Amino acid sequence: MSVVSNHHSNGNGNSTVYDTNGNDEIKKEVKDEPMASDSEVPFGELMKRDKKEKKQKKRKAESGSDEDDYKPEKRKSSAKNGKKKDVGSDSEDDYKPEKKKSKKNNKKKAQESSEDDDEESEGDVSEEDVKPQIHSDDELEEEDEAPTTDDEEEQKRKEKERRKKEKREKKERKEKKRLEKENRKIKEEDDEDSDDEDDEKAKKKKRKSKGAEKSKPSTSKKDAGGKKEPPKKKVKKEEDIEDIWEWWKEEKKPAGVKWNSLQHCGPLFAPPYIPLPSHVHFKYGGEKMKLTLETEEIAQFYAGVLDHEYSTKEAFNKNFMKDWRKVMTVEERERIHDLKKCDFRAIDAYQKEQREIRKAMTKEEKLKIKEEKEAEVKIYGIAIIDGHRQKVANFRIEPPGVFRGRGGHPKMGLIKKRIMPEDVIINCGKDTEIPKPPPGHKWKEVRHDNTVTWLCSWTESVLGQNKYIMLNPSSKIKGEKDFEKYETARRLKKKIGGIRERYTDDFKSKEMRVRQRATALYFIDKLALRAGNEKDVDEAADTVGCCSLRVEHIKLFDSAKLNEDDKKEKEFVVEFDFLGKDSIRYFNRVSVEKRVYKNLKIFMEGKAPSDDLFDRLDTATLNDHLRSLMDGLTVKVFRTYNASITLQEQLIKLTNPKDNVAAKILSYNRANRQVAILCNHQRAVSKGFDESMQKLEQKIKDKKKEVKEAEAALKSARGAEKEKAQKKYDRLKEQLKKLKISRTDKDENKQIALGTSKLNYIDPRITVAWCKKFEVPLEKVFTKTHREKFRWAIDMTNSSDEEYVF
C-alpha cells in the first residue's frame, strides 16, 4: 500500500501523517511551520477565512442549544464513489454527518474526524485546508466520564453475577418441576379408581399440548417502544363452561323446595340397531338361518359373552333363552328351542373384526367421533337450574343388552329392553320449554315437581327399578345434599355419648325387640355396618346388612385370635362372614362386650341357619328409633360419622410435620385405608398389578444404581464440583425415597378402594384442612372430580382463619 504524506495541521504546531486510503494508522508526527498572519494572507483568502469562522461559530451556537442536533462530521470516502478526491479540497461535499452510535464510538469518530480535517500538506498552508475541531456535548460528557471506567466495570460485573444467579435459580426451578413431574408419574401409576384414570388422561393430554406449544417458535411481537404485546386470553370451549355457583353463600330455599326453574333437553337415546351384513350368518343345528331384526339384535348380545364365563353358567343361559324366545316370531320359536344348537361364532367373529377396525381408526376418524360426542354434550349435557348452567351426570340412556349382575344374581341372562320415549317421564319447570321427543314419538308423562332433583325417569325391565337422569355431583343440588349430610354427622358427634349410653342400657332390656335393636345398633356404630334391607332372594342377589343378618352369617367363640398373626387370644369373639353390597364379601373377627355376646347366643337359640338373627327388627323400625334420638339421624349418618372421625383421628396419629410431601401423602393414604377397611370398601387386585410392581421394582433398582454412582462421584469431587455433586446425590436419594414410598403405598392398597370413602363418607373439609395445615397440594389427594364436587368445602375451609375440626 503506497503512503502519500498528506499533512493537515490542527493549528497547534503538530501534524499527523495518514495514508491516502483513509487508514487510521499513524505513520509519524512532524513539526509544523507557524501559521501565516493576516497581513501576509491575500484579501480574498482572508474573506474566505472570515466566512468559514462565522459558519463554525454558528455551528457551535446550534450545538450548545440542542446537543442532539449536531453530530461529528465525517470525511467522505472518495473510494466509495470510485474516484480520488483532491487532498487539499475544502468543498462542503467532503463533509457528511456521522451517524450517532455509542458514546465511545462518538469519541473515537470525533478524534478521527478532527485528525482528518486538520491534515495539511508539506507545501504552503492554505486557509481552505484548515478545518477547526468541534466537540459536541456528548463528546465532552464522554471525556468527563472517562475516569469512571472502573465503576462501569464493577457495574457490569455485578450485572453479570445477577444474571448468573437468575440463570441458576431458573435451572433449580426447572429441576424442581422435573422432580415433581416424575413423582406425579409414580403416583399416577397407583391411581385406584376410574375417576383418577380419567383425570390422568386429561393431565397427560394437557402436558402433551403444552409440550407442543413449547416446541413451536415464539411468535410474540413487540411494539415500537420495545414492549411485548399482552398475551391473548385462552378462550374456553363452550362445553367446558359451567357456572361457578357459590350457592353456599346464598339464602336457603324453603324446606322441600329444590329449584325454582329447571330447563333441559331430555335424555339421549341409544342409537338404532344396525343389521348384520349379508355374509354373516346365524346357524341353528349347523344350518344357516335368517333372523328378524329384533331376534338378530338379541343374538348379538349373546355372541358378545361367548368368551366370558357367563356363557357357561346354567342360570344365565336359562334366563337368556327364556327372554330371547319372547321376541321371536312364531316360526322362529318353533325352530329355535335349544341354546346348545345355536351357533353364534360367525357373529362373534364379526364383532371382533369391528372392534379391530375401530382400534385401527385414523386420527381424523377418531377426531370426528370425538367432535360428535362433544356436540351431544353441548345439547344434552347441560341443564339450566335457577338461571345457572349445571352439568348433567348421565344423560345417555343405557342401550339394550344382557343383564349380568354381580355375584350369583338370580336374574343374570335376562334381556334389558330398549328404552323408548314412551317409557320416559320428563321433569322440568312450568315456565320453561318442554324437551322435544324424537320425531314420531311422545313422552310417557311431563311433570313440574320442584321437590325432586331428577330430570328424567323410567323403569328398567329386569329388576323393575326406577332409573333417573340426575345432575352432576358438582352441581348445587348434589352439593347441598352432601353439606347437609356432613353437618348432620357433626351434630351426631355432640350426641354420640348419650346415644351409646342409651343402647348400652338397652342390652339388658326385658323386651326382646329392644335388646335386638340395641345389639344391632352396637354393630352399626362399632363396625360401620350398613342397615340392610329385606329382599326376595329369588328376585335379587343375596346380599345382606346388619338388620338382615341370618344365623348362618355369624359364629361365636368364647376365645379366639382375631388374626392369624396374633399371639394372644381375645374373649367373646364374633366372626362375621356374608356378602355385602355389590356382592363383596365381608369377613371380620371382632371382640365384643360380654353382654352383646350373651345376647347373640340368646338370639340364635332354637333357630335354623337360614333364620333371621334379628327377627324382631327391620330397617324402617330402626331408622324411626334413630330419628327419635336426633333429628335427621339414620343408619347412614352413623356410617358417615365413623368414617370422618376415624380419618381425623388417624391423621393426627400418623402425620409428621417434618416429613416431605410424599411421606405425608403416605400417612394420609394409610389413614384413608383404615376408613376403607372399616367400611369394607374392597376391590379385586387389578390384572396388571404384578406387572406394574415389577416395573416399579426395576425403577427402584435403577435408581439405587444411580445413587451409588452419584455417591462415588461425590467422594472424588473437588472444589466447586463438590457442591454440584452433593446436590445431585441428594436429589437422587430423595427420588429413591419417593419410589420406595410409592411401592409401599401401592402394595398396601392393592385390595382397598380408597376413593369410595373419600367421595361419599368422609367430610371433605377434614382433608382440605389437613392439606392447608401441612402444606400438601390438594391435587395430591383430591382428583379433579373430588375438587369439583367439593368446591363448597374447599372455599369454606380455605376462607376461614380457624382450623377446621370435624
Swiss-Prot record:
Gene3D superfamilies for this protein: 1.10.132.10, DNA Topoisomerase I, domain 2, Topoisomerase I, Chain A, domain 3, Yeast DNA topoisomerase - domain 1
Segments for region (Disordered): 1-236
Compositionally biased spans, kind Acidic residues: 113-127, 138-153, 189-199
Extent of Basic and acidic residues compositional bias: 24-34, 128-137, 177-188, 210-229
Catalytic activity: ATP-independent breakage of single-stranded DNA, followed by passage and rejoining
InterPro entries: DNA_brk_join_enz, DNA_topo_DNA_db_N_dom1, DNA_topo_DNA_db_N_dom2, TopoI, TopoI_C_dom, TopoI_cat_a-hlx-sub_euk, TopoI_cat_a/b-sub_euk, TopoI_cat_euk
UniProt-recorded name of the protein: DNA topoisomerase 1
Name of encoding gene: top-1
